[in-house]
Amino acid sequence: MFLALTQDIPLDHVVPLAQYNHRVSIANTGTFALLSNICPHQNSRIAKCSTEHLQCPYHGLTFDRNGLGINNRYSLEKWPVYKNQTILFDQHVGCAFPIDTQHMTLVEHRQDTISATPDVIMDVFLDIEHIPVAHAGVYDQIGITNVDKITWFTFDNGSIQFVPAQEKTSMIQDDEKYNIGACWMAVYPGTMIEWQPGALFVTVAHNTNETSSQVQVYKYRDTRYSQDVWELNNHVWETAWSQDRALAEFIESPAVDNLDELKQHHRVWSQDAV
């Protein structure tokens, strides 16, 4: 699951994560690690926001940024973090993200609620054939007018799709070398990463109940591109996301027949993960 970009987490800070309902934090001590945000003394949450100091608000117990108790016998549970470019995950991801993400800066983080399960949301994300139907004309605005030649491949816990570069009028020289107009990466379960020249959009879907999901939305701007390029990217992505949300809510349940290879791959992974 996506956690953050390295540049989101200041050095010597601990940041609670919405993906874990703020029960887990990510710590940056020069290396990254996940820490429980629950005090083992009386099960109170510790941090409310990014902080340099971990002190439980209930009885005042303090911990260092490695999770060790300070003048107390307790310690916080700790888990590894996996770095992929500057993208941080709570799991190993079997494919390096192909685009340099070091210039991305977080513009917005929000939570959306969708009346669809994470599996249905992922199905829509993986589905290539719906693009010219559900998103007719949307991606034309960023120079993607033909999605017939999308290429893709799978890896152990996800897949990645590449849209060939078409019009490069707003693409900086550093990004022209990729020859990619867009890149869409799925990391199971529930993480969807979308790159357009000048922007990165990440969605992380979790069940809230049997029929709905909470989706953490992270929107990043590449600081090498102009504000106008960002605003166009943001408009295109929000339009496509609203269309995909509506489509997901219209799907009764994940399909079991007529599955393309990307959906089949996700089904096999889901079955093996049980």
What is each of the regions a protein language model found here?
Residues 5-98, 200, 224:
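Rieske [2Fe-2S] iron-sulfur-binding domain
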Residues 37, 95-274:
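C-terminal catalytic domain of Rieske-type non-heme iron oxygenases
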